[in-house]
Amino acid sequence: MKTHIIKNLIFVGLLGFLLSSCQDKYFEDSGIHDAVYDGTVMDYIKNRPDVFDSLNTIIQLSGLESVLDQEGVTFFAPGDPSIRKALYELNENLFAIGRDTVLTLDQVDPSVWREYLSMYIYNDTYVLKDIPQLDTLNMNIFPGQGFISYGGQNMNIGVNYNDVISENSSGQKQVVKYAGYRQLFLSYILDISNVGSFGSIINAPVASSDIRTTNGVIHALEYRRHTFGFSSANFINSAYSKGIIYK
């Protein structure tokens, strides 16, 4: 029991350090990229271990590398901190029920990684200008667009048009609706029968969009506002039901 507690404390401490040491290099609102990367989507991921080291590992574990090398693919890339957050919440759950925690990514069943990673992959190439407007507070008017992910999951993709807010000479706030910067969103639909109602979708904003490669495009998700898998409860249930691989 003492060994079990020490292992968990070491893991939680290490994970906390990793999360706190994340730098701005993790694609924090860096805008739209026009240059074409000389390589495939998978090549780009492999060549950015500073951002996508854990992501590269779970791609290998899930067997999806060939999919990201195929012609015509769009990948909403979750940064490593998003993956660490999902593992942290899984380990909190395991610790609460007296189970040993996950120390390495390969302790989660590969089918779980494949199921949830497939939510971020789309056949064909979609850049920001291809996607309709999304207003998460007014989806009846600006709903974005429904998409089916590579894994068959109902998802929504849209572009949020931010407002321009300023003050006039009298100090009164002035708002110009939808005149600000545009930001791409990938959203998980919780309730397909009631899209647009409060709490019906979970949004993942994109920090850096339109990273073009020789076979497709990457949109890097904003790690501070996203946890891998969108729903921590779903990810935890899947990982637990498939069985943690203890070594």
Model-based region annotation:
Residues 12-15:
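Hydrophobic alpha-helical membrane-embedded or membrane-associated segments
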Residues 17-21:
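C-terminal motif of bacterial Sec signal peptides marking the signal peptidase cleavage site
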Residues 22-247:
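Mature, structured domains of secreted/extracytosolic soluble proteins
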